[in-house]
Every structure is written in structure tokens, then in C-alpha cells.
């Protein structure tokens, strides 16, 4: 009898222990962690149910949890707390931070001020299961979930005032991103308040934040690194060959250096290697791209001036001309960079801000019309200037050649004109390459709201990234440059060739004299 009592007591203790163990580690049946809320601060009723923020949660929809879910799906041990499957009872709205926080650049900032609370628009458009759209107060009519893990570290927000950023929030918590027609569940986005500058007035709205869309970077990386290597090789050849270090060659080297650093900062941004100095990298990249355009404009004007007015160009020494060109080609992009920096810090309206370093990209923001003012606008003007210079130069070459043929057969002048024409044609190809690639970039910016055109202009992007390769092929892998490079690298071989030729001539002369004497 005593033994039976002991066995019964042991079994009761074991069952009690197992039940407690199960309840402490159990999850709510048929309820995702993303549909739960920590209700530990709610009122527990005698029947095991909870009263939380005016909502009665039955006991079978509650459980003790000893973990929290991480963004990658792993579980992290935390102190025991009670969670309720509230999203089965009321429409939930998934926040990134507590409801009285503001998010900016992916970071939460605590405790909104009274003034900020007055600016807050608390209403959300929610699409019901029947397709109708209703407005709901985020705090009074919805259940706020704020203790769920952030989807990722680098997030960007959707501002539905922009057609590219339109979205639909559904009653079941899913979000439709209109741009690419992708449905996101609550593990892939979160909502939070954000301050928007609108002229002299600010507003605070609840907007979704989702993870950055990162396409494959392999192709772009390979093309850009190859392009950078080709630019370095081209610069090295020009620095090595003395005959290429004329005024045009020096300007061309400056142009390639600007292109090199512009691409370098783009590559650093692509691989998120410039986040520690994001704004500085964005402004430096902007400066070098603008400087490349100004150096190309210098080259086009130089050829126009030399061919249309050779006397005037001869009066200016090469060193002095290069100094003047340098002052202009470096000062103008520096001034544009200064204006852009000033606007980025002074202008309050986001539509007119350059927003360098915004949304995790260390570059000028290209999704608004402000990019046309600070980036693409100056680019268009410089492209038009270059077109004008090259057209005028081409017209002069054609007219001059026609005139020389009519007047007399001045072989010297015709030969010089042909040489000038070859140099001009070479730089015309350079301008065509750069002008076309950046023109495609501008068109891509203008039609970025159309998904079809975005895919089409992806080819143009690769063309743009490969400019270094094209320059190397056009300017280095041509017979004239290769011959000059060979002579510069192997001067002894040239001397030996001359010596051998002279010895051969002398030998032939001696043989002739020998036969004559005979």
C-alpha cells in the first residue's frame, strides 16, 4: 500500500513537471509567431484568458514563450513571457519599433514630442478581404505589433505619393509592392512613422519599410573591374609614350582619371564598401563624373579651335593652354559639387533635395526630379555642347578638304588635314561612346517608372560600365599607338635595326665597287 502511494505520488509529480515543461515551451497551435503579441502586461482573468488593450484573448490563444524569433528564422532564448495570438481576433499592423518612435535611415528614435504627435497622420488605408478599402486608426482600431524582428538591417521606405512607391496593405497583414508586383508578408516589411519635409511644413506619416532589392552584382562587378583595369593600362601607355604626352594627350589622361574614380566610387557603392564615408563617397563620385564631362568638353572645343583657327591655337603654348583648361575643367565640377552639397543641407523639400547617401546608396538620389536639376540636367547641357563642337569641326574638315581639292594639289596641307581628321575621328568615336552611354542613362532615368523600359535599358547600363574597355580598344589597340609604344619600350631594337640597315647598304656598296674594279 505504501509502495503504491509512493508510485502514485511520483507519477503525479512527473505528470505535473511534464505539464509545466510543456506549457513553458509550448507555442500556440496553428498560430505563426508573426501573428502574436507580448501580452505579459495585460490582465489575466480567472479562466486563463487575458484582457489586453481592450481585447479579450481566450486562454487557448495564449501561451508562454521562452524565445524570440530572429530575422533569419533562428530562435533566441529570452525570459519567459506570455504571448497571445491577437491577429486572429483583430487586424494587426506590424511596426518596426514601438508606436511612439520615429524611424529614419533604418534607425528608431524614441519618444515623439507633443508637436510631432500633432503632426502625425494616424490613419492607414487597409484593403479588406472583399476588396474594399477602409481607413483605420492605427492605435484605436488596429493591434500594433512592435516586438517582432526587423526584416533586415538595410531598409528603404515606400512613399505612395510617388507612383513608383505605391503599395497596398491588406487586412491579413500582407503588403503588395506595386513596382514589381511582389507580395510581402510580415517577416519581410514593417511600418513606422517617418517625418517628411514639404517646403516650410513637415508632416509625419506611417509608411512601410522593406528590404533593399539587391539584384545579382556579379555581371556588373566583372564589367566594371575590367573597365577599371583597361583605364589604368590606357593611362599607363599614355604616360609612357612621350609622343602621346602632347596637349590632347594630357587632357585625355585627365578625362580617363575622372572616369576611373567615378567608376571606382560606383563599385564601392555597389558592394557597400563606402558606407562608413557614404556622403563623402557620394559627393566625390558626383564630382569625378561631372569632371569627366567637362574634360570631354575641353577636348571637343580644343579640336574645334585648332582646326578652325590654327593660328590662334599656335599662339598659346601647350603648358599655358593645359593650365587654363585645368582651371576650368576642375573648377566647374567643384562649383557644381558645392551647390549640390549646399542644397543637400539647406533645402527642406525632399523633392528638391539631392539626397546624397539616402536609402543606403552612396550616390545622388535618382528616383526624384531633383536628379534632373543636379545631375542629369548639367549632363544634358554638356552633351549638347559637345555635339555642337563636333558637328562644327566635322563641317570645317569637309569644307576645307573640298576647297583644297578645287584650288590646288597642296599635298602638305592635305596630308596635315588627313592627320587632323584621323585624330578628330578618334575623339569623335570617344564622344559617341560616352555620349550614347550617358544618353541611355538619362533616358533610363526618364522612363524608370516603366518596368519594360527598365529591363531594356539594362543593356545600356552594361554599355556604360564598359567604357574603359572600349577606350582601350579604340586608343591603344590600334597600329599607330602600338608602334609608338614598341619604339618607346624597345629603343635598342630600333637602333639595331638602323645599324643593320646601314651595314647592309655599306656591304652592297662595297660589292658594287669590287665588281666595277674587276
UniProtKB/Swiss-Prot annotation:
Mention one GO biological process in which this protein takes part, according to its record: G protein-coupled receptor signaling pathway
Q: List the keywords (alphabetical).
A: Cell membrane, Disulfide bond, G-protein coupled receptor, Glycoprotein, Membrane, Receptor, Signal, Transducer, Transmembrane, Transmembrane helix
Signal peptide (from-to): 1-26
Gene3D superfamilies per UniProt:
2.30.160.11, Methuselah ectodomain, domain 2 (2.170.180.11), Rhodopsin 7-helix transmembrane proteins (1.20.1070.10)
Give the UniProt subcellular location, in the record's own words.
Cell membrane
Residues exposed to the Extracellular side: 27-220, 272-279, 343-371, 448-455
Q: How does it sit in the membrane?
A: Multi-pass membrane protein
Instruction: List the GO cellular component terms.
Output: membrane; plasma membrane
The UniProt GO MF terms for this protein read: G protein-coupled peptide receptor activity; G protein-coupled receptor activity
Instruction: Please give the InterPro entries that the UniProt record associates with this protein.
Output: GPCR_2-like_7TM, GPCR_2_secretin-like, GPCR_Rhodpsn_7TM, Methusela_ecto_dom_1, Methusela_ecto_dom_2, Methuselah_N_dom, Methuselah_N_sf, Mth_GPCR
Using the chain's own numbering, where are the disulfide bonds?
31-85, 87-92, 96-190, 97-108, 152-211
Q: Which ranges does the record mark as transmembrane?
A: 221-241, 251-271, 280-300, 322-342, 372-392, 427-447, 456-476
Q: Which domain of life is it from?
A: Eukaryota
Q: Which residues lie on this side of the membrane: Cytoplasmic?
A: 242-250, 301-321, 393-426, 477-518
Q: Which residues are glycosylated?
A: 47, 111, 125, 201
Give one Pfam hit by family name: Methuselah_N
Similarity-based family: Belongs to the G-protein coupled receptor 2 family. Mth subfamily.
Looking up PANTHER family in the UniProt record yields:
G-PROTEIN COUPLED RECEPTOR MTH-RELATED (PTHR47154:SF2)
Name of the protein in question:
Probable G-protein coupled receptor Mth-like 2
User: What organism, scientifically named, is this protein from?
Assistant: Drosophila melanogaster
Record gene name: mthl2
